[in-house]
Every structure is written in C-alpha cells, then in structure tokens.
Amino acid sequence: EIIPELDLIVIGEGEETFEELYDKVKDNSKDFTNVNGLCIRNKNSGYEFTAPRALIADLNSVPLPAYDLMETEIYFKFSSLPLSADSFNSKRRASTVWERGCPRGCTFCSHNGMSRIDLQNIYGEGDRKQGEKLVRISDKENDTFQLPARWPTPEYAVNNVKLLKEKFNVDFISILDENMTSNLKWTKEFCDLYVKEGLDKIVKW
C-alpha cells in the first residue's frame, strides 16, 4: 500500500532468483509464480509467497562481483572511513561480504533470508511447496535449509582481495561478514593465506 509501484520482492539470496526473473522479463512474461524466493503483489489477497528459494550450499559457485560494471572511481573518492587510522587514511577502500547466514536467532536483528532461522521467521512453520513436494523449513530431514552459516573457501576470499588489488589498486578492505571469527578454523586459514600471498603488506583490513 505504501509503495504501489512495487510488484514483487526477492526474499533471501538473489543470485539465482534474479537470473530467473531476468529470463521472465526478457520473454515479456508477467507470471512469476514459478520463480522460487519471491513475495508477489496479489490484487485479491494483497500478496502471496512463491516456494522458498534453497540456500546456496557452495558459495564458491558464486562469481566474484563484477566491479568493472560499477563507477568505481566515484566510490573510491569517498571511500575512507574514520573507523581506524588505516581505514581513515585509505585512498581506495572496498567492502566485501563472504559469509552468509547466522547460527543465532536474535530477535532484534534486521538480518533476513540467509539462514534457516531467517526463512522460518518469514515463511512460518507451515508446509510450503518446493517443486513437486511439500517441505517444512524446520524439518530436520530436509537439508535444503539446514545451513545456519556458510563460508566460501579462504582461497575464494583471498582471490577476491587479489582481484580488487590488481584491477583497482585497492589499499583497504572492509570485511562486512557478520560472524567471521565464529568460524576460527576458517579465519586462521584465511589470515595465513593472506600473509602467504603478501597481501598484509599492501591491503589493510
């Protein structure tokens, strides 16, 4: 009601959903009911949910961001932040997010759609159709949604930083992961590889 121009919203991870939406729009289709992970405006009942979108289990399968499609120089011009001496003095800072989801369920958090707990809060406890079968997000037998927090490999994350350095001469990385140090094994491996690649000397974080 507040935004009458809004036809639908994407719930949770958008990579696969946006790809399917693009195909629909390209084909001039106005029927989005078979695209998972949407909330669609419905003239009769207000809105309706399509089937939940399964969480991406392998984050290494997600391509690195196409930074070259952005006007990066405008971004870098105003990228320094007064959070630390390094971030304040940086000339070309970039932000990254590698981890998705959260193993916790804090009621005050605005984080949505990246974990089983998030999806349960959105869709509720009832059955939902997924393909030809009904699923319940809280069902322990259905591992599609049993991924509270996920990380790509440390190599993926380091390659992301190397790309930013080599193509855009970034000198500071803001890692916006919400639970980076909750996975100590991953964090230690990332830090070891970061130093091994010599990035600690040229890209602060």
Kindly label every feature range from the protein language model.
Residues 1-58:
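Glycine-rich beta-alpha loop elements in corrinoid/cobalamin-binding modules
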Residues 2-4, 63, 195:
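Alpha-helix boundary recognition
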Residues 7, 38, 62, 102, ...:
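Conserved, mostly hydrophobic/aromatic
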Residues 37, 47, 61, 93-95, ...:
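A residue-level signal for beta-strand positions that form part of recognition/binding surfaces
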